[in-house]
Amino acid sequence: MEMLDAADLRPAPLPGVEMTFTLAGVPSADVNRALYAMVGARVCWTDRFPWTHADWRAWVERPELSTWLAMAEGTIAGFFELEAQPGGDTEIHLVGLTPAFVGRGYGGYLVEQCTRRAWQRGELWAAGSGPASRVWLRTSTLDHPNAMANYRRRGFKVAAETTGPKLVPDPRVAPWPLPHDPRSASRRFQEEELIT
């Protein structure tokens, strides 16, 4: 899914509590890994299961990547990862709420604020990368049931669709406990992404 102009971003309703968004000033493999596990376990984020600590460090310590923490009620409510890519592209790699904040109406506001910051690359983060000319993300039918509708409500449009197999790991070999067996989800997924 993609957005080609910052003016296309449609605001979400304000959440019932104040949410703040802070750029992680010190890249931390441990923080990103913990948030990936906390948020992603419920929506079949499995692609990074095989990553070593060195893989995580290599990922988060790149100057073009930024990690943002969403706080509400003194608690981490969610996070997102943004990457400044060549040619003005900004990819939203991950965006999601922690389990305690799912179902409370905060998802739209999280995606709105994530997208606002994606458009502000070169200003708020990724110094020297230049302005964004496109913001894009990948999602799938294995994501949260409301994710695709939320992205559309914020102004994202489908750029391309692909259907293919997804390896869904046996939860007994997951690097952290999972709340349910992801193999019960569909083994096929539709991925909406920008194909370059």
Range-by-range predicted roles:
Residues 102, 128-131, 136-147, 164-175:
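Conserved beta-strand-loop-alpha-helix junction that forms the acyl-donor binding cleft
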Residues 47, 51-54, 60-67, 71-99:
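A conserved beta-strand-loop-helix scaffold within acyl/acetyltransferase catalytic domains
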Residues 13-48, 177:
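Short amphipathic alpha-helix that is part of the acyltransferase structural core
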Residues 94-97, 103-120, 134, 146-153:
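Conserved acetyl-CoA-binding loop-helix of GNAT-fold acetyltransferases
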Residues 1-18, 153, 157-196:
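Terminal substrate-recognition subdomain of acyl/acetyltransferases
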Residues 5, 94-96, 139:
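Short, structured patches in soluble enzyme cores that scaffold and shape functional sites
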Residues 66, 133-135, 157:
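Short acidic/polar active-site loop segments enriched in Thr and Asp
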Residues 120-130:
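Alpha-helix termini
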